[in-house]
Amino acid sequence: MRFLRHIAVVVALAVLAVGSTIVNAQSADLPDSAPIATIGAGSTVSVNADILLPANQGTIYLQAGSVTTWEQIDKKAPSCRLNAVESPVVRRLVPGRKLVITGTTQNNGSVFFYGDVLQFEEDATVSQFQCSPGHKGAMNIGELKQVFGGMFSLIQAPAVVGE
């Protein structure tokens, strides 16, 4: 009888170990080499720096962790443009604010420069990031992090498997 109890305990521990491994595998972040189009909905872009959004301007360009202009961007290096909702007043993104990603689109290898897009949950300030790796093909997560520098962080949502 005791022997059966020990077997039940061993089986329960094995099930817990396998379940824990599966959960850990599902919640692992995508590698930096993965295309940004694979970033899951529910992931967030967290604001780490105080960023002013100028009045009457709907686009802010980012490269290597700083705000820049279209004229100053190195077109052969990763960059993004943040599409802000046009407003007659100056606004700001404050540290700690999270922009929830609802989806991604990709216009791989086209003549359209900003072909990789992170779309955000409806927001009164920011609608999306449009990004370019600076080369033909898709932008990857590592290149996105390079663009963000210390200004933003990507927080990936756990993967949902089988739903």
Describe each model-derived feature in a short phrase.
Residues 123-163:
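C-terminal partner/receptor-binding element of secreted or periplasmic proteins
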Residues 1-11:
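Bacterial N-terminal signal peptides that target proteins for export
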Residues 46, 51-62, 121-133, 137-139:
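Solvent-exposed hydroxyl-ligand-binding patches built from regularly spaced Ser/Thr
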Residues 101-124:
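SH3/SH3-like beta-barrel superfamily modules
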Residues 21-25:
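Sec/Tat signal peptide C-region and signal peptidase I cleavage site
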Residues 26-103:
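N-terminal secretory signal peptides
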